[in-house]
Amino acid sequence: MCGWGREFETLNLNDYRINFYGQTLDGDRFDDVVAKMRQADIVVMGSPVYWHNICASVRTLMERFYGTIPEGEFKGKRLFFIYQGAAPTKMMIDDGEYSMSRFAKMYGFSYEGMATSRAEAKKLREKMTIK
């Protein structure tokens, strides 16, 4: 449990084998990650800015949703996005925001926003305690 009253579980996607879209290799754990997301009221996704965009592990998870998870499946769940890099440009931030907000819309999440700095993360944290 975190210091402000919410229990949470952290999943590091690098610890889960998630096959690329279209692959059917043994050991895929996509369903395990999705099951954890279904159990949560709030999903906080985080990614470093990597090669000007969302990192491969998060991007692969998002891509695997397509055609597998019904649109609107996560209706009622809240999604927050933490996106951090050494010196992201406005274009990089805008692209990450677009990708995550579009993902949220397709799958029914209430997209609560993105944080790219400590100050923005604090504002998102406050939003988590409001509802």
Language model segments and positions:
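Short, glycine-/small-residue-rich phosphate/pyrophosphate-handling segment
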Residues: 75-114
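Mid-chain, well-packed structural core segment of small domains
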Residues: 69-74
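N-terminal beta1-alpha1-beta2 submodule of the flavodoxin-like/Rossmannoid cofactor-binding fold
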Residues: 1-68, 105-106, 111-131
